[in-house]
Amino acid sequence: MNIKMISSVDHLIIAVRDLNQAINDYEKVLGISPCWKGKHTELGTKNALFNFENTYLELLSPCDAGPGTEFINSLLAEKGDHLAGIVLGTQNIEHVQEDLNRNGHAFEISSGEAINEKDGKIRRWKNIFLPNTLSRELFIFIIQHTEGNLPQHESQDSSKVKK
């Protein structure tokens, strides 16, 4: 049986210094508000997510001490606010890990969690982070969402798009 390892471009990550200003700017461009604002407590980062029909955009900012803050701060110091990563989606991260390991790589699966500031709901996922040697210096990881969903936005309001 041939199982598809990667099923989607799950989301794009934009590293930002000032999350509130970035939210304001992207609301004007996209015509929608973020469906989720939260914090990765174990990483020391906070984010805002703009959900679309088949993917979402994550604005990611440092906030507390942690490995995520160190990583985002290094990206921001080098390039300023910018497209920082691509996240590939899978339905079976263990299969992806087995396949990658079978091809001579040793990858561990890590877990993540975030809490929505708006309603306290929790989302959980599993990740495999790809090294720069495989991703050609682009921050890429593979994700399988395991618990919770992003709220869908009602509809895009073209009156919010500012010229």
Protein language model annotation of sequence segments:
Residues 1-5:
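Basic/polar N-terminal segments that are highly enriched at the extreme N-terminus
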Residues 6, 13-63, 102-103, 109-124:
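Core segments of cupin and vicinal oxygen chelate
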Residues 8-17, 48, 53, 58, 71-162, ...:
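Vicinal oxygen chelate
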Residues 30, 35-37, 56-58, 71-74, ...:
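Short, surface-exposed linear patches
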Residues 43-44, 82, 136:
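Short, basic and Ser/Thr-rich N-terminal targeting/leader segments
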Residues 51, 60, 87, 141-144:
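Residues in well-ordered beta-strands of folded domains
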Residues 64-69:
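A low-complexity, Ser/Thr/Gly/Pro-enriched, surface-exposed linker/loop concept
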